[in-house]
Swiss-Prot record:
This is DNA-directed RNA polymerase subunit beta. One of its GO terms (molecular function) is DNA-directed RNA polymerase activity. It comes from the Bacteria. It comes from Rickettsia massiliae (strain Mtu5). Belongs to the RNA polymerase beta chain family. It catalyses: RNA(n) + a ribonucleoside 5'-triphosphate = RNA(n+1) + diphosphate. The gene is rpoB.
Amino acid sequence: MVSLRDNIEAQPLSHNRRIRKNFGHINLVADIPNLIEIQKNSYEKNFLQLNIKDSERKNKGLQSILNSIFPISDSSNIANLEFVKYEFDTPKYDVEECSQRSLSYAAPLKVTLRLSIWDIDEDTGTREIKGIKEQEVYMGDIPLMTKNGTFIINGTERVVVSQMHRSPGVFFYHDEGKVHSSGKLLYSARVIPYRGSWLDLEFDAKDVIYFRIDRKRKLYITTLLRAIGMSTEEIIKFYYNSVTYKLVKNKGWAVKFIPQHITAHRLTSDLVDADTGNILLKAGQKITPRLAKKYFGEGLNNILVAHETLIGKYLSEDLRDPTSDEVLAKIGEMITADMLNVINALKIKNVNVLVINPQSGPYIRNTLFADKNQDREAALCDIFRVLRPGEPANIEAAESLFYNLFFDVERYDLSEVGRIKMNSRLELNISEEVTVLTIDDIKNIVRVLVELKDGKGIIDDIDHLGNRRVRSVGELIENQFRIGLVRMEKSVIERMSAGDVDTVMPHDLVNSKILVSVVKEFFNTSQLSQFMDQTNPLSEITHKRRLSALGPGGLSRDRAGFEVRDVHPTHYGRICPIETPEGQNIGLINSMATYARINKHGFIESPYRRVKDGCVTDEVVYLSAIEEGKYKIGQANSKVNKDGKLQGEFINCRVEGGNFVMVEPYEVDFIDVTPMQVVSVAASLIPFLENDDANRALMGSNMQRQAVPLIKTDAPFVGTGVEGVVAKDSGASVLALHDGIVEQVDSNRIVIRTLEQKVDGSPSVDIYNLLKFQKSNHNTCINQKPLVKVGHYVKKNDIIADGPSTDNGEIALGRNVLVAFLPWNGYNFEDSILISERIVKEDVFTSIHIEEFEVIARDTRLGPEEITRDIPNVSEEALRHLDEVGIIYIGAEVKAGDILVGKVTPKSESPITPEEKLLRAIFGEKAFDVKDSSLHVPSGVSGTVVEVRVFSRRGVEKDQRAIAIEKQQIEKLAKDRDDELEIIEHFVFSWLEKLLVGQVIINGPKQVKVGQTITTEMLKGLSKGQFWQITVEDANVMNEIEQIKTHYDEKKEALDKRFATKVEKLQSGDDLPQGALKVVKVFIATKHKLQPGDKMAGRHGNKGVISRIVPEEDMPFLEDGTVVDIVLNPLGLPSRMNIGQILETHLGWASINLAKKISTLVKEYKNKHIGIEQIKKFLIELYGENINSILERPEEEIISFCKKVSKGVHFATPVFDGAKVQDVKDMLKLAGQDPSGQVKLIDGRTGEYFDRLVTVGQKYLLKLHHLVDNKIHSRSIGPYSLVTQQPLGGKSHFGGQRFGEMECWALQAYGAAYTLQEMLTVKSDDVNGRIKTYDSIVRGENNFESGIPESFNVMIKEFRSLCLNVKLEVTSS
């Protein structure tokens, strides 16, 4: 056996990784979790459960929906359709083919269903199985997720955004005194299910409790309690305690003394011990709870109260006549003076009354007596009348409706989360599998609501992240699936009842279109399925990690208040407090924090390190907001000694409610993993974030997402250390799938022989086809460049090719440029930016943008449209870029108005008959009359044609261009196949050679003699095919050769088969929309150089527009002659408080000066003035321990590393744990610069020094996607609105500029009457005047006449619509 790990080059690719000088002090224990895990886990793992065997699938996602909808039975229970299992076929087209052909990337869902037919005996009613049919049924194509967490729908990449919504469960709150004029708090409760009716409970101003179902008319709460089967006695006994008053002869009543019921007040009568008769306190004296407890402790059990004390109390049971047992008063009735006289007359000795006091109000009792419904039937009918007004209420219908509302699993679902939340809030212990309401739930909700009113407990905070959960992709699509399957269930039942069930197969019953249409509708039109923001890799990642409170079942931006949008203490480590849009969506659309993840219940969790006895361990625990409230959590920057013990007498900790307390080290339960866990990915890319104002940091995070990928990428000198993670997880770069050795590299693809052996011991081959000049969703350019060389050894997950906006595996959204802060002739007034000509000349900020144009040749009723070069009335000059078919060549330079694809459409006075159509088809006649409908380059676009794609309908003959493109693609596929085969052959034949050398030949080709011993030289003279003809003596060797031959043939056959399938797919024609014969797509790439009007920004929210490009010789320059690239206005800093940019500039200044110092050392080393030790010493002083791995390598590699940092030393200053001002000064000193970071600058125009020192340094700037080329627009003549006859507005309509009301005032103020008349007539909507003006211009005259503007006629028509006739009377002057 040959080992694949032989002859591996010593140098792995990981040696090329960039090393940054890291200023962070906190040791990272946890890695950043995969940034798009939230999308992939939710959909693939939890919803589809792809690649999991049927028997091992958990009851969640698709499996649980199918289990809940099936079995489906018909009305008579004769037929029963059961679900067995489901599986997915392989998708017809891969991701790339789907995006090229405008198709959806989806896999067919095959569900195995079992149809059981029963025989029912009409007399006995017994059932017997008559027959069982099992069949695999196609249920439509289900969109699959790409490896980057997106969906391809109709050829475009889309993202399904996760939604934040209120968690199911019960919530208690009050109106904050806003409803009632007195400011009285009205408490209410709401039960929110996952699906089903909402139940609201509320107090009114008179302290009566009501309930509503689905916000309908309110009813008394006791109606609901009676409906769930409680009697008056049960209601009173459940919600109230009872106390007995015993008659004491001639003295009054003795009653139990309960100190808990005593509040501080002055006594109106004496406090007398009923057992001893002692007076403990006189009337008028004050009693307090503490004094009451003291008396109770001293043995006071019963107290004596006056006879009339009972008046106003409520009975806790029926009052009966001791002699006749007749009911004198019912439970809950108030004792009046008359009733007291009856009690005295009948000598009733014991009276039981309700305990009602300030801690236990009479609300339920009052509601009970206000409610007219006295039994369950009346209560149910009352509820029925509210929910179904106008329908006759009978008890069966009412009972069925009430059961279906809250107790039917089909219609009401609290979900597991809802049940957990309900149990915890109401202190119940009901099984998590019970996801409907129970009687206990309702009773206890009322209990908790009344307790809140009595001042016990606290209301819920709706914005607490324990009360808001996240619905990710999987769950959102699961809900759509359920809707689709429920609709399908109805059609299945109809079909079962309609046809002869005995002859039907399962596929006859199922109509998959219903299901497919619901899923399609979700992906195409839902507010949460969004066109992916693909401006750059960061914007992609951020879009996938977005949390939206909007969307179906969420909030609407008009009704969302301030509280929902605000930052909540529980957002810490879960939702970024910085990154959110400016504008009306602020706070409603958020971004997940860097380390956050979503647990199985949909709550966001954040990681913490466990602290045991004051020692910080490396154990990382993820806590949700609910769990976190129970612990004391320290900050990540708490001081820790070498042994991990927390230092200091007290540690600052967060506790529940977002408050901070100081506790001793042994009381701390957890500490943060890293300070970076607070912010999102975009915010974690901002160095010195801690020195920026939050508003500017917000703008900085948002603007990084708008940075355009540039031609030349450049990772920031001053980074935060997260750049590599973002590039890796975004999917922009290419990662190695396995360990391996690079066999071939060119700009289009990388071939790697992997080191993971297959079962037969042969290597597998990974071929990575790189994306070249592809168009992104936002017309930016996706282009991948290889980072590896032939012979490199790569490890799994190494980055082997850079994508857009990445540089050596790190995200690189902009460029490092030399910046000076000083005013320059007013050209950088109000955030304007002044740039040097060098930046334009050297393409520093040049980007490529790709536009796609499409033309469709359709079959019209006058005959087919044709793509051709033969276009009527078009000059040969205009056709110069088209090939013989009429399609533009690749590489052609085009400008606005040029023809891209020639197309003619038949036009005729009358439609042609079928006979004519047939004759034309037979004799090949062209249409008599055609019009030009070619695809032209639209206005404002120019560039180079980089790609052309031609799609032809199946059965339509392909033209030469389509055949040429197809041939090109087949050649590419063949090359991939041949290269893979070559690597396998190389391996197989070198293995064969090892086996054969030294063996004795028995039989073989002509060139060899029998009995000879095989040598390497002998084998070199044979062709590869002749190796198999050799037979040797050793039987074991022959067996092994036979095995190798079998494996080799299988491998070759599999490769050929795969190639044939792909070729067949290419040649088979395309699925085009109805009526389309041919589709041609043309891609034009445009280079956008930086120019005045383009918007630029830094990472700190400092944005501006370019005002002027200045020649290099006029720009300020340094004393060594270096010209400054960009001049910014220093006045943009103080008021905006984003000081991080200044620290970045200073550290950038240190970076390039340290690089110069290293270059000088390398020069001296080459000139033999110094040894390698001095270089090592300087590198250790600069990088610290980070550099040890490099210093252990040979001298050439150390020098090669020094050359890599010759442009600038790369720093990492992690957010909230980065470089302090002193660190920046130390770096400046090490670089031999003034620690102030300021230098003398010379004015390029005068050659004189500026008066003061100027802050100069390297700063990272981005070019944003707001390019002046896409915004600038002008019009002389163009389209007019049909009704008003005024020019249209906006660039997309080629419109004019509106001369509005205020502009008219300006002309009136100047008295410019003629100009005003011209603006309001001929330049606007005076149709005749326009024509006359044109005539006079053509004749060379300068005068014009204005007539009546069309708007005047429109106004007259509007008057007429109001039945007012207005006539214009023209009087001759």
